[in-house]
């Protein structure tokens, strides 16, 4: 449940907490980039709603400088498709980045990590993670030719989530040795 929705909606059905956030930030943080950051997968209907919300926020005279995607891959059902159908889902991401650039917005992939439920299969999990990261970075590098695109990691090693079996993995293992995902990112940066 989103408690912020208890603040209500405006006359056009847009959440007041979002409008108020961008109104305050536009006024009080003129030198800070304002990012509409979303945690989910590439569900078309959801992103259409977000795009419409961004355009609406801007129509009110408030700044939105970029879209952010919190890329917690396999965190929930909403991000499973990225691992199961990466080509299809990353095509949606590419289209979303194109839309952002067409509307003079930067695009940030934030909080990138990869959930491995069965930690007895780390080698397989790390291989799959590296494959997804390689495809993701290819899209990001291609789209960076047309506008601002950034990538950051949620953490550097492993973390767990209370009540959830498995681990979130980044670019180093439990002993801080590079994982295959590290090598994918390093190679991409050298090109």
What are these regions (language model features)?
Residues 1-24, 29-36, 42:
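Active-site acidic/histidine proton-transfer and metal-coordination neighborhood
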Residues 1-12, 80-108, 113-191:
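Aromatic-rich peripheral "rim/lid" segments of glycoside hydrolase catalytic domains that contact
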């Amino acid at each position: 449940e989103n408690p912020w929705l208890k603040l209500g909606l405006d006359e056009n059905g847009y959440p007041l907490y979002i409008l108020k956030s961008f109104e305050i930030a536009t006024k009080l943080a003129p030198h800070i980039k304002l990012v509409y950051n979303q945690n989910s997968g590439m569900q078309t209907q959801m992103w259409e709603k977000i795009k419409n919300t961004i355009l609406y926020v801007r129509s009110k005279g408030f700044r939105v400088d970029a879209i952010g995607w919190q890329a917690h891959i396999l965190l929930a059902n909403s991000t499973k498709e990225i691992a199961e159908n990466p080509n299809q889902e990353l095509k949606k991401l590419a289209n979303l980045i194109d839309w952002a650039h067409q509307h003079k917005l930067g695009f940030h992939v934030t909080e990138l990590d990869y959930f491995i439920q069965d930690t007895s299969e780390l080698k397989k999990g790390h291989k799959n993670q590296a494959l997804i990261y390689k495809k993701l970075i290819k899209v990001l590098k291609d789209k960076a030719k047309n506008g601002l695109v950034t990538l950051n990691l949620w953490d550097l090693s492993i973390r767990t989530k209370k009540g959830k079996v498995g681990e979130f993995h980044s670019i180093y293992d439990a002993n801080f040795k590079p994982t295959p995902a590290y090598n994918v990112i390093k190679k991409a940066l050298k090109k």
